[in-house]
Amino acid sequence: MQGLMDESSPHEKYMQIRLTAFLCTPVLTELSAMTTEEREKLSHDAADYMNSLGSSKSLQWLSSKCTSEAMLEELKEGLRLLADVGKKAKETNTVLMIDAEYISINPAITSLALALALICNTDSAVVWNTTQCYLKKSYHNIQEEFKFAKANKIHYGAKVVRGAYIVPEGEAARLGGYPSPVHDSYEDTNRSYDRIVDWLLTEISHNTGKRSVRFILASHNKKSIQQAILRMNDLNIKLGENKVMFGQIYGMYDYITYALSKAGHPAVKSMAVGSVSDALPYLSRRSQENSAVIDGANEGRQLLKLEVLRRMRIR
């Protein structure tokens, strides 16, 4: 809660949260094992529970799904905390971006993110779920989320990333003897990312109703960013509407962020908050998610060198 400002601001703020900070992995794993229909029911019933401030009995059917009563109680406690964060986000004009995390718990994360969206996205898009484009089912998954938001008449927001767990997910599939859920190549992931961004931009351009559609293109890939900007121009998506955001990690690819901001695009920096031991694994995964990160760093150093030389000449 300390990451949410106490006072509202005319400027929109952004905060990333991980549901594993609210619920333990075993609970999320069990919920992820449920059927698609059960997880959709979970979204509605969890929203009802959060809306009732924990007094609703809508989650009692989960007693037969959880291996222990303690797990169900942990779910309820986690939802009460999540409801508090959602309420604070609405009060302080803060967008909550829900991290996707590992595929073994991602279905439950999506269900609970949609539950929070049901209670927070009635007036604007406060809760944005994350789509990991390295997954083969990513295009299908984001379309299903979009349909859910449309059917329930709530505003829609998304965070689009390539994904930070490519190596461990592929290794887990190999050791487990099941087909890898991730795309076979980095090029396939790029195509997946650009396809999803193009689809979202098209939905934004076709959206004439009161229900807003927004997303953040979280990427260090110049080609994807350039393609998105060209597509925005083709679709006449105006900058001042803030329907499309751009984001990079704090301390990485600053020249891209600054160039976007200078051109009038809403651009933000993502910063990990916590101890060094907590933050380093997070940043390491983000480095792995883009195979061009080293080349990009070299390019950044070259640009920095040119800027230093330019300033020396000015003096």
What are these regions (language model features)?
Residues 1-315:
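Positively charged, amphipathic and often flexible ligand-engagement surfaces
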